[in-house]
Amino acid sequence: MAAPVVTMHQLIEAGAHFGHQTHRWNPRMKPYIFGARNGIHILDLSQTVPLMARALEFISATVQAGGKVLFVGTKRQAQEPIAQAARASGQHYVNHRWLGGMLTNWKTISGSIKRFKALEEQLAGDTAGLTKKEVLQLTRERDKFELSLGGIRDMGGIPDVMFVIDANKEELAIKEANVLGIPVVAILDSNVSPEGIAFPIPANDDASRAIRLYCEAVAAAATKGGRDAALASGADLGAMAEPLAEEAAEV
């Protein structure tokens, strides 16, 4: 069965066709711009739909093959949808701040994750031998780790594909992915460059409703990949098979 798709109607309803003011555009996005209206660039959704479908198929196939997806979106309106989508699909995310070397210096990051997990175990266990001040310090350290590493604590290595909201804001994350040869799927507004993006998706990257639509679509594609892998392995999925057969292609 094909991966979930996002329709033209859904994109228009979410305001995905609205780019930025024309004077803020990046000329490299010209091939994806339909025109301008009242000083605002209008993105060409007739390209967005097939490009989105292509990206979702790739994500689904990657997960089916045992790959991991890293959702990245640290701007305010993307933080919650990014985390929810990653959790719902059993994937991983960064939604607070991208730490330099998060992928290219994975060995150091892995050490920090070990410390994070050790803190969680310590605080969940018997803290009777610690002073209130010591418990507070450990709690603050754990909370700091939760913000920066909570979404990748169980990733276990670099991801196989990265999904990005706002390529400008997440420039460092994209550069690290490029260095490591990790394919990047990114929502590209009219003010960004498509350079370094393996799967460009021209669409508004600011509207909350649109961001949620993209995140849910990627989560659905990743979930489908996981289910297909389980079915292919001959796992007994019980009642899962019936809903799968009836699942609509549309998100």
From Swiss-Prot:
Gene Ontology MF term list: structural constituent of ribosome
Swiss-Prot/TrEMBL keywords: Ribonucleoprotein, Ribosomal protein
Chain coiled-coil ranges: none
A Gene Ontology BP annotation from the UniProt entry: translation
A Pfam family it matches: Ribosomal_S2
Gene Ontology cellular component terms for the protein in this record: cytosolic small ribosomal subunit
Domain of life: Bacteria
Family: Belongs to the universal ribosomal protein uS2 family.
NCBIfam families, sorted: rpsB_bact (TIGR01011)
Name of the protein in its database record: Small ribosomal subunit protein uS2
Organism annotation: Novosphingobium aromaticivorans (strain ATCC 700278 / DSM 12444 / CCUG 56034 / CIP 105152 / NBRC 16084 / F199)
